[in-house]
Design a protein with these regions (language model features):
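Extended, loop-rich substrate-binding clefts of extracytoplasmic carbohydrate-active enzymes
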Residues: 197-279
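Solvent-exposed N-terminal domain segments of exported/luminal and surface proteins
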Residues: 126-232
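Bacterial N-terminal signal peptides that target proteins for export
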Residues: 3-25
């Protein structure tokens, strides 16, 4: 290497050193600025399990936010959360646990490794960019009153009164499989319309176009988490939904309430209201089903997962879990994984009967039944039956041992 080359190398090294120093200075200034603007206390979130937690939503009461951060309700809309380790913004959402009420909870979407910990600081920033939504749902009047909802990994739909008027009666939950994080509800309905107009089934959302498809057969079954009254040998279910209220449209939790008209079940008229919520990244809906009926005696209710011909079913004898490795309508579409989880406090019993995996409980009028039901796809992020069984088992453990939240200075 000659003298001129040495000088060029030294000059280049000096420039790189200056650039690194300048970037470090900028980072330090930003760090100081963020820290100096932080509100009174920080929130420490701890995973008590030796299981990785990915895309999990933590609910923090706004009463705690007011108490520990010393801010008013008028400032809630301006609050942002920062991961202190990465200095990245944590996705958040103001959420109300009561339909029509003011928000009472701050939702945080985080990931934690096994036995991991995350410290979050909070700031008020009216100029922060709007967060992109990770959940979506809407009524679909152009498709006979369907209602569909989704997140990054799965989509669902239920059927409304306009479809019932054609003679198609179903209160089961349909599954749409997808392999991309983008929303598919609008594009699938557009495909369905184009297929009908052109009489070309190649456009149908029942065909996998590289994004996903609808290949799940609901019919009059409970589909993926519908309910009914259990008589001991059969399910007596409602007709299509009659009304829906959207409670929250995101960006990290989509929630809505479904109402059903009264129906006669085992000699008794009953009505049902379901509250359904789907969090970003989760395969499972949280469903709170409440039946009302006359009298003081309890009745047996069941949440069901349809079992189609050729499906494999796993129900651990000591767990409130049912995992179905199901067969799609299109044999080339792999397998559709469906299942549900109920926590021990629900006193539910899992069994198979009437071509369903069932979660059976006893409830008096007005007593809620809470469970989780959902689906995945072998051609997306759930390639094997063992993966699905493990997912449901881990899901149950994570709900039984939630993330620990503590305020620190």
């Amino acid at each position: 290497m000659n003298h001129r080359t040495d000088l060029r190398s030294l000059a280049l090294l000096a420039q790189m050193t200056q650039s690194i120093s300048r970037n470090l200075l900028i980072l330090a200034v930003l760090l100081i600025a963020v820290q100096s603007s932080a509100l009174a206390q920080q929130l420490r979130l701890t995973n008590p399990l030796k299981i990785d937690r990915g895309d999990e939503v933590v609910d923090i009461p706004l009463a705690e936010i007011t108490q520990h951060l010393h801010i008013s309700a008028a400032q809630f809309q301006s609050i942002i959360a920062i991961n202190n380790a990465t200095m990245q913004r944590i996705p958040t959402q103001l959420f109300s646990n009561r339909e029509g009420a003011q928000p009472d909870t701050l939702l945080l979407l985080i990931r934690l490794p096994a036995n991991g910990m995350l410290d979050a600081s909070f700031h008020l920033d009216n100029s922060a960019p709007q967060q992109g939504s990770l959940v979506f749902g809407r009524a679909v009047p152009e498709r006979k009153d369907d209602f569909a909802w989704e997140n990054q990994v799965v989509a669902y739909r239920i059927y409304g009164p306009a479809l019932e008027a054609t003679g198609e009666i179903s209160s089961g939950i349909d599954v749409w499989s997808k392999r991309i994080p983008n929303f598919v509800v609008n594009s699938f309905y557009k495909q369905d319309h184009e297929a009908a107009v052109t009489h070309n089934p190649a456009f149908s959302y029942h065909k996998d176009n590289g994004i996903g498809l609808d290949s799940y057969d609901v019919g009059k079954s409970r589909g993926c988490g519908g309910t009914g009254v259990w008589t001991g040998d059969k399910l007596i279910a409602s007709r299509n939904y009659t009304a829906i209220k959207v409670i929250s449209s995101g960006p990290i939790r989509f929630a809505f309430e479904i109402s059903y008209a009264p129906w006669l079940a085992n000699g008794k008229f009953v009505t049902e209201t379901k509250r359904v919520s789907l969090d970003a990244g989760s395969h499972l809906n949280k469903i709170v089903s409440t039946y009302t009926f006359g009298g003081d005696q309890p009745i047996q209710l069941a949440a069901g997962i349809a079992i189609h011909h050729g499906a494999d079913v796993a129900i651990p004898t000591t767990e409130n879990i049912a995992a179905v490795w199901d067969t799609p309508q299109d044999a080339s579409a792999g397998r559709i994984a469906t299942g549900f989880v109920a926590l021990p406090a629900e006193h539910a019993k899992a069994l198979t009967a009437a071509n369903h995996a069932l979660m059976i409980v006893q409830r008096r009028s007005g007593e809620p039944f809470t469970y989780f039901a959902g689906a995945a796809w072998s051609k997306a992020d759930m390639p094997t039956q063992a993966d699905w069984n493990s997912y449901l088992d881990n899901f149950k453990q994570l709900r039984e041992h939630p993330i620990l939240a503590a305020w620190i200075k």
